[in-house]
């Protein structure tokens, strides 16, 4: 598939389902996907992100595709979206996404690669927030995103979580970063200290949302979502669709599309 040509020799079902949908999503104003009107245009950002896309493999292998081929790869992703997923062209226009997928299905790449394409690396304000239930997952996501974006000059990812000194995290945030990966409690603390500034956030990802709710982060999640700009995209990943997930979807997601991966 075209996703395989991005460097994923064995893309997982959640990657095949989510990546094409996000790349088609019109709420990504800066998505670097060729269209009938601009297919001949290339931008510096497209070149950088295309090189990055070809560098990633499911096994963490080195670059397997030449950078000059990657614009063609992105175009093929666009063309192959219908065959790569069961999502219709109409449903691809939905703004927000709920993806029901188990842990260990490659979710970070599924949302990480498309989200990275929407970031302006010249702007040091926070543009993406990713919430995770544990310190370990928070660090894993941050490490993966740093790996994916290693060819994007000026892009900074900061992980913030409890159980360690907050001072170092405050210093990192004050330097500016485009992506914050956080546990809900620590992010709330940094918001109250007016260190985490979320007024420019365009994408919010809730990874393992059901686990965060089970751990008692309901109020924190509500406060974080309520503090974000109205114009944003929300991506919610969960293993189950329980009552609290449905409540969050009804309260904070707009015209969302539900993707179910696996049984």
Go through each PLM region and give its residues:
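Conserved SF1/SF2 helicase motif Ia
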Residues: 90-103, 116-141, 152-156, 229-231
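Acidic, glycine-centered low-complexity repeats within long intrinsically disordered regions
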Residues: 48, 52-59, 65, 72, ...
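Walker A/P-loop NTP-binding motif
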Residues: 19-28, 108-123, 143-149
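Conserved pre-motif I regulatory segment
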Residues: 1-41, 80-98
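Post-DEXD/H (motif II) to motif III coupling segment of the RecA-like Helicase ATP-binding lobe
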Residues: 197-206, 210-262
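Residue-level signature of catalytic and energy-coupling elements of molecular machines
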Residues: 3, 15, 99, 115, ...
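Conserved nucleic-acid-binding Ia/Ib motif block in the N-terminal RecA-like helicase ATPase lobe
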Residues: 124-192, 200-203, 246-250, 258-261
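Methionine-biased hydrophobic packing positions in alpha-helices, especially
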Residues: 103-105, 115, 191, 212-215, ...
């Amino acid at each position: 598939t075209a996703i395989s040509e991005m460097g994923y020799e064995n893309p997982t079902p959640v990657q095949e389902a989510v990546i094409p949908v996000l790349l088609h999503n019109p709420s990504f104003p800066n998505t670097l996907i060729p269209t009938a009107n601009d297919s001949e245009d290339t931008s510096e950002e497209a070149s950088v992100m295309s090189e990055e896309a070809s560098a990633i493999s499911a096994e963490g292998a080195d670059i397997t595709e030449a950078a000059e081929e990657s614009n063609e790869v992105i175009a093929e992703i666009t063309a192959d979206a219908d065959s790569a997923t069961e999502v219709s062209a109409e449903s691809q226009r939905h703004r927000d996404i709920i993806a029901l997928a188990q842990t260990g299905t490659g979710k970070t790449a599924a949302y990480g690669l498309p989200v990275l394409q929407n970031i302006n690396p010249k702007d040091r304000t926070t543009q993406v927030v990713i919430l995770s239930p544990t310190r370990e997952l928070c660090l894993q996501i941050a490490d993966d995103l740093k790996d994916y974006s290693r060819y994007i000059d000026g892009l900074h990812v900061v992980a913030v979580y409890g159980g360690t000194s907050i001072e170092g995290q405050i210093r990192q945030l004050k330097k500016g970063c485009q992506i914050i990966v956080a546990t809900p409690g620590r992010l709330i603390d940094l918001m109250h200290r007016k260190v985490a500034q979320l007024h420019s956030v365009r994408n919010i990802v809730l990874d393992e949302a059901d686990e965060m709710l089970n751990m008692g982060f309901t109020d924190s999640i509500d406060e974080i979502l309520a503090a974000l700009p109205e114009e944003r995209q929300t991506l919610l990943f969960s293993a189950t669709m329980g009552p609290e997930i449905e409540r969050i979807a009804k309260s904070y997601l707009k015209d969302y599309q539900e993707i179910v991966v696996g049984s």
